[in-house]
Amino acid sequence: MAPSRNGMILKPHFHKDWQQRVDTWFNQPARKIRRRKARQAKARRIAPRPASGPIRPIVRCPTVRYHTKVRAGRGFSLEELRVAGIHKKMARTIGISVDPRRRNKSTESLQANVQRLKEYRSKLILFPRKPSAPKKGDSSAEELKLATQLTGPVMPIRNVYKKEKARAITEEEKNFKAFASLRMARANARLFGIRAKRAKEAAEQDVEKKK
């Protein structure tokens, strides 16, 4: 590997006939063609289902650095499916991914994904298992004629940014200490239980003193 940026200049100590062990990438163009053919074969195999696979939930990226962005998750939580009125076993059969390990930590995420599931159900064209005997919930014959295979992602997720208009900075904003406030908030969250315990012990001691 060539030296990059302001690091130490390396002195590679090669042994073991390294020239016979150089990793080459001559298969890259053929690999690209193979991947494309595999995608096309899968799309033909699963038709008329969406080529990109089942619908995925909207999740927020972890850590402070990335939590302003949303992306596709692994699967919908059991709570989201329950609120949307879809059985977990049925969900997988109609192109909805399920992840039983996932937990909803906010009402907003739950509501957003429930809304996503309801919108998906309203747009879904469901083929009957037996064309001669359609069941309740299956799409009508007119809808089945309109069905085409979706090639892109199912209901793509977009990051929406709200642009704010330029305005004058207030005195309160100038005096606000962002880093100190974050440190204080973290400290308060960390020490919440200890402080509650101390307050309880102090109250008990006061009661004993009064006796």
UniProtKB/Swiss-Prot annotation:
Coiled-coil positions: none
Top-level taxon: Eukaryota
Residues that bear Phosphoserine: S52, S77, S106
Pfam families: Ribosomal_L13e
GO BP annotations, alphabetical order: blastocyst development; bone development; liver regeneration; translation
Cross-link Glycyl lysine isopeptide (Lys-Gly) (interchain with G-Cter in SUMO2): where in chain: K123, K145, K174, K177
Ribonucleoprotein in keyword set: yes
Keywords, comma-separated and alphabetical: Acetylation, Cytoplasm, Isopeptide bond, Phosphoprotein, Ribonucleoprotein, Ribosomal protein, Ubl conjugation
Covalent cross-link site, Glycyl lysine isopeptide (Lys-Gly) (interchain with G-Cter in SUMO1): K174
Entry keyword annotation includes Acetylation: yes
Main localization of the protein described in the UniProt heading: cytoplasm
GO cellular component: cytoplasm; cytosol; cytosolic large ribosomal subunit; cytosolic ribosome; synapse
InterPro entries in alphabetical order: Ribosomal_eL13, Ribosomal_eL13_CS
Modification sites for N6-acetyllysine: K16, K177
One annotated GO molecular function: structural constituent of ribosome
Subcellular location: Cytoplasm
Complexes and interactors: Component of the 60S large ribosomal subunit (LSU).
Family, as annotated: Belongs to the eukaryotic ribosomal protein eL13 family.
Described purpose of this protein according to its UniProt entry: Component of the ribosome, a large ribonucleoprotein complex responsible for the synthesis of proteins in the cell. The small ribosomal subunit (SSU) binds messenger RNAs (mRNAs) and translates the encoded message by selecting cognate aminoacyl-transfer RNA (tRNA) molecules. The large subunit (LSU) contains the ribosomal catalytic site termed the peptidyl transferase center (PTC), which catalyzes the formation of peptide bonds, thereby polymerizing the amino acids delivered by tRNAs into a polypeptide chain.
Name used for this protein in its record: Large ribosomal subunit protein eL13
